[in-house]
Amino acid sequence: MRFNQILPAVIALGATVKAQSDDDSCSEDITIRDNNPTINCEVVRGDITVDESVAGELNINGPEEIRGNLIVNNVTGLISLSSSTISSINGRFELQDLTLLSNLQFSSLRSVEDLVLARLAQLGSLTFGTTGVTRASTIRISDTHISDLSGLRIATVDSLQIDNNDRLVLFSSDLVNITDTLQIIANGNDNMTVEMNQLETAAEIQISNVANFEVPALTEVSASLKFENNPQLSSFSAPNLTEIAESLTFNNNRELRNISFPVLTSSGDLTVENNANLIALEGFPELTRIEGGVRLAGNFESVEIPELSLVTGGVNVTSSTDIEEFCEFFDDAKSRGDIRGEEECTSEDPDAIGEEADGGSGSGSGSDDDDDEDAEDAAGIVGVNMAVLTVAVLAGLTQLL
């Protein structure tokens, strides 16, 4: 009788101990060192890291949720990475410096906190879930062979950075809200088209080396909107954008001929310069307030901001052509007190277009000028150190004598 009572208790205790043991192993960080790892956890509470020695094809099956990070860096012999079970990664999904990786398939993945794909020279496309990844906080895709990003189906993101992907000539996104920064730079050999037809609000937007950028539903930019070094961009329109909080910039866009902001009423700093073919600046019919300064420089033949009634900063306008009529507009605004800072307007200025007006390609890397400055700084440091060393040596010799 007692045995019959004790036996179930012993079995139950054994099951509890085994479950506790399994739970402990699923709470630890896991390092993968072979191509078909056994991970008997539905939920991994730590990180999963792939060892640099793994080569060929790697399948990670078993876990459905990773509450830590999935890190695959410097695994230079890896050709294929896949999982049919992982549906969410609560930390970073990081793939960097995988020189041979050509296949990436996570057929159940729907959610990831931070996605980093960088320096993947052979990776041409992504396969994420049946509907793609639908939730992410930050995404960075840099220096890859990717030509298709249809696996990303995000509605809201904090930060999205896409740069230096030479084969990426089209990015069509369903994003509605960007709470921090959108950076699209140096993709598609200057011929990239970006379609963000659902985007309504954004904080910071930085665009370089694109040929087309479409945001028909955009209504508000809570930081800045910047177009710099877009040699193939010929026009831009924001038909529903009413407010830009910090700054609006068009700089060094060689083929730019038209910009249109038909309902924009308020902006921060306004800068339009070094756009050699932009001869008519008439795209601000409702702009009344500029909370900052104005810098306009180019080959303008016509400049109109008819409703402008307040500029809280200074105004500096210059053109290689005769814009005396528009200069009178700013002179009168200054005399009325509508311009609170300094005001200067110059016609027929041969230096109105700067040296960078070729609209040349930009990139995410530093410029040669920066390198030269760094070299000069380094030389200065060496010179100072040598001088200090010389003084120290002389002082030492004096003491010896």
Residue ranges of each PLM-predicted region?
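C-terminal low-complexity, Ser/Thr- and acidic/Pro-rich disordered "stalk" regions positioned immediately N-terminal
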Residues: 329-376
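Concave beta-strand-loop units of leucine-rich repeat
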Residues: 22-37, 45-59, 66-101, 105-147, ...
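Cleavable C-terminal sorting propeptides in eukaryotic secreted/cell-surface proteins
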Residues: 376-401
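Classical eukaryotic N-terminal signal peptides for Sec-dependent ER targeting/secretion
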Residues: 1-10, 384-386, 401
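N-terminal signal peptide
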Residues: 10-25, 397-401
